[in-house]
Structures are given as C-alpha cells and as structure tokens.
C-alpha cells in the first residue's frame, strides 16, 4: 500500500498540496480528476517518491518511501509523466528497453519489451526512430516502457503504476484500450493511480475517484456516488446532467 498521511507540498511560498490523506491499494484503479492547477500531478509525483512532501509522510508498505533506494523504487513502481523528451535517435524498442532491469523472475528483458509493445498496439513500431513517431505513438511506447519496468521487477513486492494524463495524445481507440489495460493490471494486483481530465472515462473505468481542487481532495469515492451535478459544479463551475450508461449503469456526464 502507498499511504499519504497529512501530506502538504509547498514550493516557492505556494501551497500545491494541503493536508492530503490517501491510500492506494494493490489491485485497484484510482483516477484523479480536477481542473488545471488542482494538484493532481503534484500528488502523483509525491506518491511516487519523486517529490518529497514539505509536511506529512508518504509510506510504502508502512515504511517511509524516502528510505527506498532508486533501484528498489524502480522495481515497485513505474511512472508515466505527462511528457518525455529524448534528444537522441533511439528506436522505439531501445526506449522500451530503458525500462528493463535485471529481472527477479528470470524473464528475458528483450522478450518482455516486445510483449509490452504488442500490449499497447505498438509492436510494428519497434524499429522506428522514436523522434519520427507521432505524439500518440510516442505515448504508447512510453506506456510500454513502464510496463517493461514493472514486468522485470516482478518479485520485489506489490507494484504500482502511476499514469499522468496518459490519454492526452491518444485517439479514441487507444484511450479505451489503455484504460482497459489499466483495469487488467489492477485485476492482477497492480495498484494504478491515473490522472485524467475526462470525467466520462474516469466514471467508466475507475474503482475509485479523487476529485481535487486548490491542492485539496474535495471528494473521494466510487464513480456512482462521486460523479454528481453538485460536485461537477463545485469543482468545474459548470452545470451538467448525469445519466446512467445504458449497459454499465455507470454515470455519464453531459455538460449543459
């Protein structure tokens, strides 16, 4: 479990997170929603151990996450940032292999990297120059890198995948495929923390949603109870209508 206890983050006299209490459990998909500047990405970086809190603590399996070495953390959690810039002409496969580490399970890193590319519908991109790929293709390659990192770290303990706006460059087909993959990983015991802007996607795939604004958690819960017209109005300052999906019965958000 990753546990944030009374976490605040202050940078340059500006409060980015304030008194955050949150737990990410293995085997669940948690989606964080909120307007620009709400603190979503800051929370992800803090939970991942990349940004130390100014106050409070982040624990991984009841131990301060700051006590884990980078090598230990890399086996336990993988992070997909909003943007990754590479200035050298690596192939897509070489980028994915950057996520590989000496496996604890004896698996072949190259085979796992190829499998990860296939998982995100990017196997045909393996030998392409990463710099020549479209934004969506690069995003899928980076997702494959994160998968490879997790797969080559199997055996170190419960694992977590942190996704910061992973659908931003993807078309509709690959948005859906990515979130189905996140659900699949959660079903296998991975704790997935995902930052999104799309309320509809969050409602259809999340086990739990965090609604953030001004560095605080405004509401937390299952999509069916959290996605309400009142919450949408409070956080986004827009009026909406909430209807049940005809198949899943999960909430669908329509902005007036």
Swiss-Prot record:
GO-annotated cellular components: plasma membrane
GO-annotated molecular function: ATP binding; ATP hydrolysis activity
Membrane topology: Peripheral membrane protein
Organism superkingdom: Bacteria
Name listed for the protein in its UniProt record: Hemin import ATP-binding protein HmuV
Signal peptide: none
Pfam families assigned to the protein according to its UniProt record, in alphabetical order: ABC_tran
Assigned protein family: Belongs to the ABC transporter superfamily. Heme (hemin) importer (TC 3.A.1.14.5) family.
Domain named ABC transporter: residues: 2-239
Positions contributing to ATP binding: 34-41
Keyword Membrane: yes
Gene3D superfamilies with a match to the protein in the record: P-loop containing nucleotide triphosphate hydrolases (3.40.50.300)
Alphabetically ordered keywords of this record: ATP-binding, Cell inner membrane, Cell membrane, Membrane, Nucleotide-binding, Translocase, Transport
SMART domains (UniProt xref): AAA
Record carries keyword Transport: yes
Role this protein plays: Part of the ABC transporter complex HmuTUV involved in hemin import. Responsible for energy coupling to the transport system.
Entry's EC annotation: 7.6.2.-
Subunit structure, interactors included: The complex is composed of two ATP-binding proteins (HmuV), two transmembrane proteins (HmuU) and a solute-binding protein (HmuT).
Subcellular location per the Swiss-Prot or TrEMBL entry: Cell inner membrane
